Amino acid sequence: MLSALARPASAALRRSFSTSAQNNAKVAVLGASGGIGQPLSLLLKNSPLVSRLTLYDIAHTPGVAADLSHIETKAAVKGYLGPEQLPDCLKGCDVVVIPAGVPRKPGMTRDDLFNTNATIVATLTAACAQHCPEAMICVIANPVNSTIPITAEVFKKHGVYNPNKIFGVTTLDIVRANTFVAELKGLDPARVNVPVIGGHAGKTIIPLISQCTPKVDFPQDQLTALTGRIQEAGTEVVKAKAGAGSATLSMAYAGARFVFSLVDAMNGKEGVVECSFVKSQETECTYFSTPLLLGKKGIEKNLGIGKVSSFEEKMISDAIPELKASIKKGEDFVKTLK
């Protein structure tokens, strides 16, 4: 039922080329010079939904901004370099996207990124809490299962926490699930929608194939293999790139899809549904990804898990201890900060 509410996968990207009097979102990308940041910034610049695009990084942002600024779309682009320029980058923003951080290399898990990326995310979100406390915060930086609790705790410290405006971007898991199911069934991937719940690492990634639109069936061995491929798809890319990075282009696409859906909802479009890792009461985990109905002020309604198969139910049970540990790790990290 939940997946029936969601529009087909590529609709948000297609819709970003529509026209509306409200297409004036001010979006900031923090980590704009990186492997995800550059293609993400390109996709955002290409959208008429965006009127102002501010780019931040600790290196190369003036060049990235100059390059993008020549593109014949309306979004005004400006680059900001280094911590002293971050406040100006954030002022007046409606949406902040954070792909900043170090990428995975072969043999690394998303959790191996924790020590470096936790500090980066805590620093950037503290600036957001100070300079654009009302903005929607979309965190791409891994491990998302920990960086979202970090973001929440930082906002609490600054007294501006709103759980309806902090999102862990798990959209790439949905994009991959849609693609892989479509490949196996000979379908158009743009017409497939698979909700993916849980978290954004390994076995915490739980594709609900039983809720796929259109309905699909797989024998158990194929279903197990498909689920495993969705869960380890990021590692598949890391290995294929052989040390030259992780999933950047597909992640940029997924990040843009989420931002466009969010801006559509902020503009008053009804029925916009995306999965995201957020503060949640759906399970015993304090954060959990489920389909969300988005609205003008962020999360309008958590649509929950819905009806699942016994195979999916077991995956949820198996994921909870790992998710709880990752969440606690993020929360504990913020306690160590001055």
From Swiss-Prot:
The modification N6-malonyllysine is found at residues 239, 307, 329. NAD(+) binds at residues 31-37, 57, 117, 140-142, 251. Pfam families: Ldh_1_C, Ldh_1_N. It comes from the Eukaryota. One of its GO terms (biological process) is malate-aspartate shuttle. The modification N6-succinyllysine is found at residues 78, 91, 185, 203, 215, 239, 269, 296, 301, 307, 314, 324, 328, 335. Acetylation is enhanced by up to 67% after treatment either with trichostin A (TSA) or with nicotinamide (NAM) with the appearance of tri- and tetraacetylations. Glucose also increases acetylation by about 60%. One of its GO terms (cellular component) is cytoplasm. It is linked to Developmental and epileptic encephalopathy 51: A form of epileptic encephalopathy, a heterogeneous group of severe early-onset epilepsies characterized by refractory seizures, neurodevelopmental impairment, and poor prognosis. Development is normal prior to seizure onset, after which cognitive and motor delays become apparent. DEE51 is an autosomal recessive form characterized by onset of intractable seizures and hypotonia in the first days or weeks of life, and severely delayed psychomotor development. This is Malate dehydrogenase, mitochondrial. It comes from Homo sapiens. The lineage of its organism: Eukaryota, Metazoa, Chordata, Craniata, Vertebrata.
